[in-house]
Every structure is written in structure tokens, then in C-alpha cells.
Amino acid sequence: MTRHFLALNQYTKEALDALFALTRELKEEQKKGIPHRILEGKSVALIFEKSSTRTRISFEVGVHQLGAHPLFISSATSQMGRGEPVRDTARVMARYCDGVMIRTYGQEIVEEFARYSSVPVINGLTDLFHPCQIMADLFTVIEHKGKYDGLKFAWVGDGNNMANTWIEAAAILGFDLALACPEGYEPDRTVWDWAQKKATSSITITRDPKEAVRDADVVNTDVWASMGQEQEQKVREVAFKGYCLDDDLVALAKPDCMVLHCLPAHRGEEITDSVIEGPRSAVWDEAENRLHVQKAIMASLLK
């Protein structure tokens, strides 16, 4: 049976820990200049229906460093953008390529693609989940803190794909997670209900960012209006007033807390310049670790 990386809920704690271990190994080799062309001679299709900076660059570079050939495909240059059924594209690409990464809108698109693909499919981002990013975030926490268990994670802002994936991660890995979201901007209800049934740790939601951040080891946020929600920007600015990660809010967390943001950041909205540039920020390590985590995911699925 073909294995895919579509959402964290497919994986056990042990499987995710194994990916973190492989990430560390590949990162150390890369820093030492030791080649690891594990996927020599293979080809990986990178399908983008949403524009990207970090996802595209990190996947293209990662595929190259693993010895494979990346094929960038946008909706404007593929038949998917003209209405070809997902199942048809999936079947054909599987005949040409050894793996596929998709960055798109609906989670149902990557799931249908995987259902009809005979090669591994990786979720590069959907409106529901962003599993590669959360894996990079968690690996960054492991690097800085030495662990994730026993820590309190805080999420401040929109209950978006990042928040949904953090909820899944907390339920699977067993760390405490406190979310602060305005009314009407909560995480996906199905994801929330699944996590509440599965979790052995504390996963809570509040309207008060101070309550969520207080005594946190890791504080995380994201933009108030995600891609495709630009027309809601003004309404969201009103709804998210008081949800900015500034120095006063971060001061409520533990003195050695980490601040994360998946980028791009709208400085002065969800996070201030002083916080993202400050000593608690691990944002740039987090961005780099997208490369290493995604290499581990591809290596584990495609080798």
C-alpha cells in the first residue's frame, strides 16, 4: 500500500519521532557537507495551486539535495488549472514521477490525489492542514528545548490550518496546547472533536490571549487573513484586535520561551517587529527547518 503524508492524524507518536530523528541526521550531514543522495535518479512533481516562497524553495532545494529531480507545476501551466479531474492527473503523474507534493486549497484535493496515485503524495499545505510546517516547528522546539513533552504551547490568532495541525500534533504527541481565538474564528470543529477524544494532554481554547500565553514555553502565531481571505482583511483587523504578539503579551510567557511564526509575517498586525527580531524569536531557525524536515519526509516515503 502506498504511503502518503497528508495529515498528522495518519501517524503515531513513534512514527513522528522517527521523522524527527531522520531530520536531525540529514541536517547534521548537510551542515558537514556530507552528501545524501538517497533519491538518486528519481523525479518529484511539485504542484502549486497556491503561490509560495518557502514551500517552493525548500522543496526544490530538498529534492535536489536528495539527488532527485524537482518538477515545478503551477495551476496556470497544467491541465488541473483548466478543470482536468484530479483523479486523471494523479494517475498520469504517478506514471511519470516517483512522488508528488501538492500545495492547494481543499484538503479533499490532496486526499483524492492520493487515493488515485500509485506513488507517495505529500501535503505541502491546504486550507485545513499544514503538516510540513508543524513538523518543522516541532523540530525547532526539539533543537532549542531538547524535547516537546512537558512543555506548554500557546497559539494566538486565527483558528486556521496551522491551528488545526497544532491541535492534531498535541493530541498525538501529548503536549499541552492553549489556543486563543476570537469568536467566529475557532479551529475546525471536526479536528477539535477528534483531538478531544484522542488527547491525554490538555488542549484548551479561550478568547483571552493573556490566558493562553501565560507560562507558555512556546508561543506561536500566524497572519490574521490567510491566502484567499484578503477581502476579509478589514473585518479581521477588528476581530483580532488584542491578538498581537507584542512585548507585553510575550512577557507573560516563561522567561526562556520561544516565539514561532511560519511566515510571511505582517509586522505590526499579528506580531510586532520587536518580538520577531527579539532574542526569543526562533523564526529563522524554524524557516530553515522546513528544508530538513521535508527532506526527511521525502526520504522516508520515496527511498
Curated annotation (Swiss-Prot):
Q: In which pathway does it act?
A: Amino-acid biosynthesis; L-arginine biosynthesis; L-arginine from L-ornithine and carbamoyl phosphate: step 1/3
Q: What does this protein do?
A: Reversibly catalyzes the transfer of the carbamoyl group from carbamoyl phosphate (CP) to the N(epsilon) atom of ornithine (ORN) to produce L-citrulline.
> Which Gene Ontology molecular-function terms are recorded?
amino acid binding; ornithine carbamoyltransferase activity
The lineage, from the top, is: Bacteria, Pseudomonadati, Thermodesulfobacteriota, Desulfuromonadia, Geobacterales
* E.C. number: 2.1.3.3
Give the enzyme's main class according to its UniProt record, as a single word: transferase
Catalytic reaction(s) noted: carbamoyl phosphate + L-ornithine = L-citrulline + phosphate + H(+)
State a single Pfam family of this protein: OTCace_N
Give the similarity note: Belongs to the aspartate/ornithine carbamoyltransferase superfamily. OTCase family.
Instruction: Return the GO cellular component terms, semicolon-separated.
Output: cytoplasm
Q: Provide the residue positions that the database annotates as binding L-ornithine.
A: N161, D222, S226, M227
- This chain belongs to which protein, by name? Ornithine carbamoyltransferase
Q: Which cysteines are joined by disulfide bonds?
A: none
Q: Which gene encodes it?
A: argF
* NCBIfam families noted in UniProt: orni_carb_tr (TIGR00658), PRK00779.1 (NF001986)
Query: Which residues are noted in the entry as carbamoyl phosphate-binding?
Result: S52, T53, R54, T55, Q79, R103, H130, P131, C132, Q133, C262, L263, R290
**Primary location class:** cytoplasm
